[in-house]
Amino acid sequence: NAQLCVYHRGIKVVDLWCSKIHDPNFGADSLINVFSSGKSLEAIAIASLVGRGLLTYETTICEVWPEYRGGGKEHTCVADLMRHEAGLATFDTAIAVDDLLPENIKANRLGSLIENQDPHFRSAAATRREYHAMTRGWIVNEVFRRVDPAGRTLGEYLAEEISGPLNADVVVGLNDAQLRRVSDITPLGIRCHILASFRPKIFGRKVLHNFFQLMARLLKVVLTARKNFSASKPPIQNMRSINFFNDERMRRGETPSANTHASARGLAHIAAVMAAGGQLGSVECLSRSAWDLLHKDPQPASMGGVLPTRFT
C-alpha cells in the first residue's frame, strides 16, 4: 500500500494512492505509520513554545523540568535535545508500552524513567550527535507538557492546534475511530533490498545504492552500532521486530519520533504550511519569527560517526 501527495506553492498538485495487494480497505484517507516524519512535528511543537515566549532553544531542560538533572544532565539544553546531542539515544530500561498512553505520560511514568537515566556519550566531543530514533520524541513530550500552559501532551497539542485547524490526518496516539483506518506496516526485509541492489540503474533499480555500496554502508552502520550500543535493550518491553508497531497498544500510545500516523494528504498539507513560512491561508502553525528561529544557524556534525548532518 502506498500514498503520494505533493503541494506546489500552496496548491495540491499530486494526490495518488494504490494497493499492490488489492487491499479493499486502503484508500487516500488511510493512516500509515510515517516513522521519523514525526520528528518534524516535534520540532514544530517546540518552535510553537519558543514563538510564544515560553521557552528558548538555549533553555536548559532542568529549568523547566528540575528532576531531569539526574545523572549529570543538568547542562543539556533544548537545542542539544533537538540536535540529537542529549546523550540519550538509548535507555538502560525498556519501557512498558502502556506507559506511552497519554494518561500515563501525564502521570509521569515515562518521565520518572528519563529523570533517572544517565546520559551515554561517545568519548570524542565531535561525535556527541547520536540518532535518538525513538527517545527524542519521548523526551520532547515531557518537556512540552511541562511548558505548555494547558499541560497537553504533544499528541493533544497536534490535534488541537495543527491537525484539527488544517483538517489534516496526522495523529500521535490513535483513538478507536482512527484505529479502524490504519494500514499495517509490512517490512520488505534486508533480503529484498539486497536482491534489488543487484539490478543495474539503467534497468530501473528501485534502491539508491548498488550491492557493493549497500554492503559498505551497512557494515559501517552495524560496526558503529555494536561499538556504541552493544549492551542496549529493546526500547520497549517485548519489542522484537518492527511488526510491534502494528500492536494496538503501541498505536494508542505517544511515540512521536517513530509512531506518528498520517495520510499522505495530511502530512503534505502540514509540510505545505511550513514551506510557506508557517502560515497558509487562514491557518497559522507558527509565527514568522518562530519559523525563522527554527531554521536559524544549522550546525554540521557527524551522526554517530556515520552520517554527515546539519541540524539547527
Placement of each model-derived feature along the sequence:
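A short, well-structured edge-of-sheet supersecondary motif
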Residues: 1-25, 57
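Secretory-pathway/luminal and periplasmic proteins that interact with or process carbohydrate-rich
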Residues: 13-15, 68-76, 87-93, 165-175, ...
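Active-site-proximal loop and beta-strand segments within enzyme catalytic domains
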Residues: 21-134, 142
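Penicillin-binding protein/beta-lactamase superfamily catalytic region
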Residues: 176-307
